[in-house]
């Protein structure tokens, strides 16, 4: 994907939680939110970091997912996705969801270094200008629920961490420019530390302040040691929308987007704006209203 006029803009949606058909009035509000934000922002890339829909107890979840993909596709803006813990809970698998995405989305960004590990897809989207890579977007499927009894949520697998280490090292330019951004659904455990250094936004999640896995497989350590990673943007916690910093790495929550999802923090999205010269990454939250 190419920079335009020295900039590249991403709009990140997360936790839209579309449910059963016919659509609930809250789902209609979420579609309207998507319309307003994409019309106002006109991004170069749309990112969705999971919990695109509820799948548990949802009849015809394949149709629900296809309708949502068709809704995004009408904008003819490239769409990149990863999945959350609710997308493939019941009746559908991640591979089936990827097939629907592939068949439905007509404007897909070019993925590189694609690897699927235990049905979890991981890939990179380079952002370029005149053939030169300027920034790298890493998409990691952070899984669903912990199946081993060590906590509530799954963790990024060691094999995925190794894929990230190898791929990010290959993309290094050795100029100390932090040009890599990771998108995934579930936060890494280091968010517990970084929430003590919030740059903007709120931390209002009450069940657990940070709904991270109990097992730490070293993804953050590899981000830090690489030296050229700006940070990570996740979803999952609907009442957290903060950007924070730990050891110079940004750990941020995107603003929750779906009106079917719990939480009193106003629904919206997060904008990531990347400037080439001088190189800079800025993020900001958009909130549509103060209602759930």
Q: What do these predicted regions represent?
A:
Residues 19-22, 54-57, 81-93, 145-148, ...:
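Active-site environment of divalent metal-dependent phosphoester hydrolases
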Residues 2-4, 124-132, 219-226, 240-292:
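Binuclear metal-dependent phosphoesterase catalytic core
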Residues 7-20, 134-144, 183, 250-256:
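Active-site-proximal beta-strand elements of phosphoester/diester hydrolases
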């Amino acid at each position: 994907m190419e920079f335009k006029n020295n900039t590249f803009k991403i709009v990140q949606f997360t936790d839209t939680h579309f449910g059963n058909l016919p659509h609930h009035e809250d789902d209609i509000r979420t579609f309207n939110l998507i319309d307003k934000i994409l019309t106002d922002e006109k991004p170069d890339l749309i990112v969705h970091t999971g919990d695109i829909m509820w799948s548990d107890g949802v009849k015809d979840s394949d149709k629900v997912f296809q309708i949502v993909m068709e809704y995004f596709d009408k904008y003819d803006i490239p769409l990149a996705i990863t999945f959350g813990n609710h997308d493939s809970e019941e009746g559908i698998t991640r591979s089936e969801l990827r097939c629907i995405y592939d068949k439905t989305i007509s404007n897909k960004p070019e993925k590189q270094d694609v690897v699927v590990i235990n049905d979890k897809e991981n890939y990179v989207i380079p952002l370029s200008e005149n053939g030169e890579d300027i920034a790298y977007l890493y998409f990691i499927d952070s899984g669903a629920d912990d199946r081993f009894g060590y906590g509530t949520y799954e963790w990024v697998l060691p094999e995925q961490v190794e894929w990230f280490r190898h791929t990010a090292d290959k993309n290094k330019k050795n100029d100390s420019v932090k040009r890599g951004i990771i998108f995934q659904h579930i936060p890494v455990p280091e968010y517990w530390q970084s929430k003590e250094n919030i740059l903007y936004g709120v931390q209002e999640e009450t069940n657990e302040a940070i709904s991270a896995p109990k097992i730490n497989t070293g993804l953050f350590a590899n981000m830090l040691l690489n030296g050229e990673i700006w940070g990570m943007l996740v979803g999952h916690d609907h009442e957290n929308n903060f950007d924070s910093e730990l050891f110079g790495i940004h750990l941020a929550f995107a603003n929750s987007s779906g009106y079917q999802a719990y939480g009193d923090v106003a629904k919206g999205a997060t904008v990531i704006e990347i400037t080439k010269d001088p190189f800079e990454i800025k993020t900001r939250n958009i909130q549509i209203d103060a209602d759930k």
